[in-house]
Every structure is written in C-alpha cells, then in structure tokens.
C-alpha cells in the first residue's frame, strides 16, 4: 500500500487514509473555515462508521494505491 502525506484539507469524498486503528474511507466531507476544521464520516474496513473532525492543517497519510 502506497501513501503520501497531505494536509487534511486536501481530502475528498471516497479518499482513503491511514489512521492509528485502520484504513479509513472518507464520506460526507465538509470544511468549516470559521473553526479551521474539516468534518467527515469515517468508515473503517470492518464497516463501522463514525463522525470525525480534524484541523485543516493536520498532515495525514493518504492512500494512493
């Protein structure tokens, strides 16, 4: 699995990134410029989903292949 570091603000729907607990698929991506955060629904490989948020400038490891 290849990945590259990108800022969280560069994520889009259906992108995948590596988190501490598994590979996460992003859906329902929204940017909140007032609070400088992004919110999204994170779906793990086992099918469980949760609402998450992170700072726009946070570096994440986006899966590219």
Task: Specify the residue positions occupied by each region the protein language model found.
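Residue-level marker for the onset of beta-strands and adjacent loop->beta junctions
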Residues: 12-14, 38
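Short, functionally important structural connectors and interaction interfaces within domains
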Residues: 1-3, 21, 46, 52
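Mixed-charge, Lys/Arg-rich low-complexity intrinsically disordered regions
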Residues: 1-12
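Basic/aromatic-rich interaction segments and small domains that mediate binding to polyanionic partners
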Residues: 27-53
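Short coil-to-beta-strand transition motifs
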Residues: 16-25
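Intrinsically disordered, low-complexity, charged/polar segments
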Residues: 47-65
């Amino acid at each position: 699995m290849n990945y590259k570091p990108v800022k969280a603000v560069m994520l889009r729907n259906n992108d995948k990134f590596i988190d501490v607990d598994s590979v996460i698929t992003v859906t329902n991506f929204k940017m909140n410029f007032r609070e400088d955060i992004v919110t999204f629904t994170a779906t793990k490989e086992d099918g469980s989903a949760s609402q998450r948020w992170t700072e726009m400038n946070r570096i994440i490891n986006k899966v590219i292949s």
